[in-house]
């Protein structure tokens, strides 16, 4: 019983950091016309999901936010979801 407790103390669980889905070789391009891609990063209430939840890099998060705002302005995405 004590051996099991000691191994748990020595090796704590480390959560692996997620990588940005938009950086890499086969990464999708952020485009304001790609509604299916943009909808994955909008909450149920219509808000843009923060990068700490989606693990998107800061640069790509800004691009994504601008694409979502542009799509909203053009009427491709709703501002508020009821």
UniProtKB/Swiss-Prot annotation:
Transmembrane among keywords: no
SS bond list: none
Species of the source: Bartonella henselae (strain ATCC 49882 / DSM 28221 / CCUG 30454 / Houston 1) (Rochalimaea henselae)
A single GO cellular-component term on record: cytosolic small ribosomal subunit
SUPFAM superfamilies assigned: Ribosomal protein S18
Q: Which UniProt keywords apply?
A: Ribonucleoprotein, Ribosomal protein, RNA-binding, rRNA-binding
HAMAP family assigned to the protein according to its UniProt record, in alphabetical order: Ribosomal_bS18 (MF_00270)
Name it: Small ribosomal subunit protein bS18
- RNA-binding as a keyword? yes
InterPro entries attached to this UniProt entry: Ribosomal_bS18 (IPR001648), Ribosomal_bS18_CS (IPR018275), Ribosomal_bS18_sf (IPR036870)
- Oligomer status and interactors: Part of the 30S ribosomal subunit. Forms a tight heterodimer with protein bS6.
A Gene Ontology biological process in which this protein takes part is: translation
Q: Cite the residue spans of the region called Disordered.
A: 1-25
Sample GO molecular function, one term: structural constituent of ribosome
Q: What family is reported?
A: Belongs to the bacterial ribosomal protein bS18 family.
Its annotated function is as follows: Binds as a heterodimer with protein bS6 to the central domain of the 16S rRNA, where it helps stabilize the platform of the 30S subunit.
A Pfam family that the UniProt record links to this protein: Ribosomal_S18
């Amino acid at each position: 019983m004590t051996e099991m407790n000691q191994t748990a103390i020595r090796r704590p669980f480390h959560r692996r950091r997620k990588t940005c889905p938009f950086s890499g070789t086969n990464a999708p391009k952020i485009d304001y016309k790609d509604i299916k891609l943009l909808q994955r990063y909008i909450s149920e209430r219509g808000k843009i999901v923060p990068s700490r939840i989606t693990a998107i890099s800061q640069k790509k998060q800004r691009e994504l936010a601008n694409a979502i705002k542009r799509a909203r302005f053009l009427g491709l995405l709703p501002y508020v979801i009821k």
